[in-house]
């Protein structure tokens, strides 16, 4: 009896499994009949297996590359997969497509070894003495990622001693970002460069581009033009008139704004500073703000502040007229929010903050400067207030501040939120900051420098997802303070937030060399800094 029931049940089950699927039936019902298995680690395992065969066991090499007498036993497939140059070589009708041995003339043996390391391993140690050659060769062999990383490295390390050579190199390789970085260095150090061999042999079109981009009058650009012409007067005299016509001199602009309070007053004061090349800092003006300030940023040459008795009002300090002008107010009251300038969109973004009811906000709105209009957009992933903000190529990095814990009490935050101003999307980085709470940040090239309470300045590289800690002078670390930071003229300036009246100190860091210089005795009336803007 039991066997009959079992046989009957088995027949019913098979009949059910073999019957055509009814419309709307779930695919899960046929899971044990068939399904597609996808091995998610397959491609990585295959790649690792191929590399092991090629490198560790040195099997299947089918081409020999000879460079300066040294022979490299390599693989056409691997070279072609990484480099369009080699793919074209091996698939063309040229003799290199069939030759077992190929001789390369335009690269040194040591640099080609670095290229092989990169092609096979994906890692390469970039050295300053070979960087320019690696930059050129990686472009020639169409190793795009390596070329772009070399470009970023060169842009970070460009300085007076190599800026003209780097500018010429970037021009040859049609690299606008590197070209702009080198040109900025050249025009702000023209007085130092005008007697160098590199400057005197500079092509006419590069000199024209430098002097037409706005050279500070302190760099004596007219004298530099004369020096260039006189070096080869017979051939260059014809360019004299066009060069003088192209020259655009600019005055010494305000570089840094300090916003803070005097000990005896309740409202804020805006002090404008000029940072000279000899490390001196002078006060070029000051403006009284008859209001409490809750947020501020510098956009172009103008200063924008939000505050007032109704904390949604905004004013602009016109750098040309030194007058305050009304701007469109924010859509709603906001405290402790973060203002960030995005020049590429001619806009100012307001992110996070607190409501008047002391509730954290995740709102993001932006101000279109040309239209004098505020517009709401998508929200932050995590509501924060008092965060540091930095714009890097249209991505706003919101750092630290305060966030809610699980019980909705505020706590110091270590989060890094990234808001893309092109897509209006926000995401949180999977790693956190090395410290929490209130901090201040400034961008230098493709790096973000962050300073907080303590004795450390941190350099954050978003491209590499890495942090580098730089120590401040011991005299500063003895008295904990929330420091402020600004990026100006290729240097990083750090200010303490409290001073003895009338005597402020700051220190200047050169990111290329890590050299630190201290500037003492800046004569300002501020005793408590709220914002430092550059």
From Swiss-Prot:
Keywords: Kelch repeat, Repeat. The keyword Repeat applies. InterPro entries: BACK, BTB-kelch_protein, BTB/POZ_dom, KBTBD4, KBTBD4_BACK, KBTBD4_BTB_POZ, Kelch-typ_b-propeller, Kelch_2. Gene3D superfamilies: 1.25.40.420, Kelch-type beta propeller, Potassium Channel Kv1.1, Chain A. Residues 61-128 form the BTB domain. CDD domains: BACK_KBTBD4 (cd18481), BTB_POZ_KBTBD4 (cd18272). Disulfide bonds: none annotated. Residues 163-255 form the BACK domain. Kelch repeats lie at residues 255-301, 302-344, 347-394, 396-446, 448-497. The keyword Repeat applies. Substrate-specific adapter of a BCR (BTB-CUL3-RBX1) E3 ubiquitin ligase complex which targets CoREST corepressor complex components RCOR1, KDM1A/LSD1 and HDAC2 for proteasomal degradation. RCOR1 is likely to be the primary target while degradation of KDM1A and HDAC2 is likely due to their association with RCOR1. Also targets RCOR3, MIER2 and MIER3 for proteasomal degradation as well as associated proteins ZNF217 and RREB1. Degradation is dependent on the presence of an ELM2 domain in the target proteins. Component of the BCR(KBTBD4) E3 ubiquitin ligase complex, at least composed of CUL3, KBTBD4 and RBX1. This is Kelch repeat and BTB domain-containing protein 4. It comes from Mus musculus (Mouse). The lineage of its organism: Eukaryota, Metazoa, Chordata, Craniata, Vertebrata.
